[in-house]
A protein has these predicted regions:
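A short core secondary-structure module
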Residues: 147, 151-184
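Intrinsic disorder at enzyme termini
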Residues: 1-8
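A structural signal for short hydrophobic beta-strand segments in well-ordered beta-sheet cores
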Residues: 139-142
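Short Pro/Gly-enriched beta-strand edge/turn motifs at strand-loop
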Residues: 119-125
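Hydrophobic, small-residue-rich alpha-helical packing segments that form membrane-like cores
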Residues: 131-133, 148
């Protein structure tokens, strides 16, 4: 089995490393101290293809694959954990929407994540009583006509104030065993 990186994977890692050195490390401490969201850097990262890394090109993604994506996020994390978490979650939001949503929802949101029109994507999982233990969430979603009605509370939404789109996790089948019957 060959564990060497491909030239493309090395290029993406090196690009993320270079971007982190030049754009993230110099401002990371200041952003943290000021509790400032890195809108400018996230837009630049989208322009470099770092948002939507595992998304098909027809939706605006860069299709670099899981290894290259992991390498890029690792390099970003070396400069600032906050940038890395936002990048990681935003990519995961794009992946969930691409995989599980209707074509209409995919076409509306995924290109805007990939091109940086949305500063970030967010997950709403965390609840006051259970933290981020998704198997124990209590928020419910009940289908009414052509929509869902949510009932419950989320206590932390990653990048919530800056997100252009939020994927909310809720129980849709209360009769299912623990950890099952949950939808996004």
């Amino acid at each position: 089995m060959n564990f060497n990186l491909t030239p493309e994977q090395e290029m993406i890692r090196d690009m993320a490393r270079d971007f982190t050195e030049k754009n993230i490390k110099p401002v990371a401490a200041q952003y943290d101290a000021e509790k400032r969201f890195p809108y400018d850097n996230l837009k630049k990262m989208a322009e470099l293809g770092l948002m939507g890394m595992n998304i098909p090109a027809e939706l605006g993604g860069s299709e670099v694959g899981a290894v290259a994506s992991s390498l890029a996020i690792t390099e970003i994390a070396k400069g600032c954990a906050s940038h890395a978490v936002t990048t990681s979650v935003t990519n995961m939001v794009a992946e969930v929407i691409t995989e599980f949503c209707t074509e209409e929802v995919r076409k509306k949101h995924v290109p805007r994540i990939c091109n940086g029109d949305y500063p970030a994507g967010s997950f709403a999982i965390t609840e006051p009583h259970t933290g981020s233990d998704a198997a124990n969430i209590r928020m419910t979603a009940v289908r009414r006509d052509n929509t869902y009605v949510l009932n419950g509370t989320k206590s932390l939404i990653t990048s919530g104030e800056a997100a252009g789109v939020t994927v909310t996790w809720a129980v849709t089948d209360p009769a299912a065993r623990k950890g099952k019957g949950i939808s996004a």
